Amino acid sequence: MSRAVRDVQNSDFMGRYAEGHPNEGSQVNRYYQGTAKIDAVERTAREEIKRLFRCRQADVRPISGNAANTAIALGYLRGGDPIIVNSTDAGGHISHNTIGTFGRRIQSRGKALTSGKTNSIPLHYFPLTEDRYHTDVAKSIDLIERVSPRMIILGRSLFLFPEPVRELSGVCRDRGIPVL
């Protein structure tokens, strides 16, 4: 392995998360902080790609769970469609949060959606048991019946215990609610 590759592997870029878009001044756009150097590299790369391809927009972030969730959000959901997800406090993916794909980043027909507005995606979070480590299945079923979501999204960035797929998918199937 070359010294250059080792240097990159030993750098801050190998282990630091930089989800979201670069912070701009006092505007915080990242879920994790301490990303000033990554922000600078990403901004430079974005500007270089725009210049190279003579385009107005470019996204240089690596393909990830965010990209997959964006495809679902843009292809399946419309403003006002409620969804039920795991909160980031419960290990849920950042894209399931108000600052992620299903929160403020989703667009509908070219119009940016703003969290809490009529054209946003109303986010509901799976209730947790008292220990805050497990999904409360009974309360989740109640939430599904009450909210009648367009879809539910299981899965997390942090898995400590299995998700209640079997328990919730049956309820959703009976109501025609897709489970992702």
Where are the regions that the model predicts?
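Conserved N-terminal alpha-helix of the aminotransferase class I/II PLP-enzyme fold
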Residues: F13, A18-A67, P122
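Short catalytic-loop micro-motif centered on adjacent basic/acidic residues
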Residues: Q57-V60, M151-G155, L180
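Glycine-rich, histidine-containing beta strand-loop boundary motifs that form or position
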Residues: R61-P62, V85-T88, G155-R156
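Short acidic, glycine/serine/threonine-rich loops at helix termini
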Residues: T70-L74, I94-G100, D136, E163-E167
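Conserved PLP-anchoring active-site segment centered on the Schiff-base-forming lysine
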Residues: L77-H93
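PLP-dependent aminotransferase-class I/II
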Residues: I99-L154, P162
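Catalytic PLP-binding core of fold-type I/II PLP enzymes
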Residues: L160-L180
